[in-house]
Amino acid sequence: MRLKNLIVFALATSFISTSLVSASADSAKPGQSMTHMKTGAGLASTLEAAGVVLYVQGGATSSVIGDSIGAAAGQYVFHIPITSNKSGVQHLGSNIVFFNTANNLQLQLRNPVIELSTGVVRALVPQAGDQVLDILTITNASTLKAKITRDRKANLRTTAYVGATLSLAPGIAASISSILGLPANSLPDAAAFGSADVTLYGKDKRK
């Protein structure tokens, strides 16, 4: 498979959302708001074949489903702590990194913010002059509904958004290719990117 196809598939099926831990980390601790991202089966091996590895920094962690990242069915799973949801779902202190081992170039997505109301995921990108860029579009934002559950004993309210589908934001594909030193037009504009689940915990104010 040509490098172009490898990179397109790799970035088209990611999330995002980080150090390797057991896949059992998929469940957040009680009371800890979290964004979970999972790549499509085969992404890890495709990235490896293309010389691009995906990892996280800061408070985020990751796990691998399957035998290894080189296995055909291997999947990355990212667990990114939510630090606030007053102005978008914020992940202060967590970075998602694409690293091209062929040339040591990297793309960092720092402190990503999920704007559920507008259907956009933004992040600060140091390699783009520290600009805050629209990185992803939530393609099903208009139909994404919150599921709310309450534990009155624990005075806990849980708000879950399950199955947010993501694609590259318009125009960002060319920037990713350029920053990683990939051939021009390696990524199609608005390519499918993956999915994410968001779980928010808070006090149950309803009596």
Regions found by a protein language model. Name each.
Residues 9-18:
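Bacterial N-terminal signal peptides
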Residues 2, 17-22, 205-207:
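N-terminal charge/polar-biased segments
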Residues 1-8:
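Bacterial N-terminal signal peptides that target proteins for export
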Residues 24-87, 163-207:
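N-terminal segment immediately downstream of the Sec signal-peptide cleavage site
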Residues 61-143:
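Predominantly extracellular/secreted and cell-surface proteins with exposed
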Residues 124-174:
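Extended amphipathic ligand-handling, pore-lining, and cofactor/metal-binding catalytic surfaces
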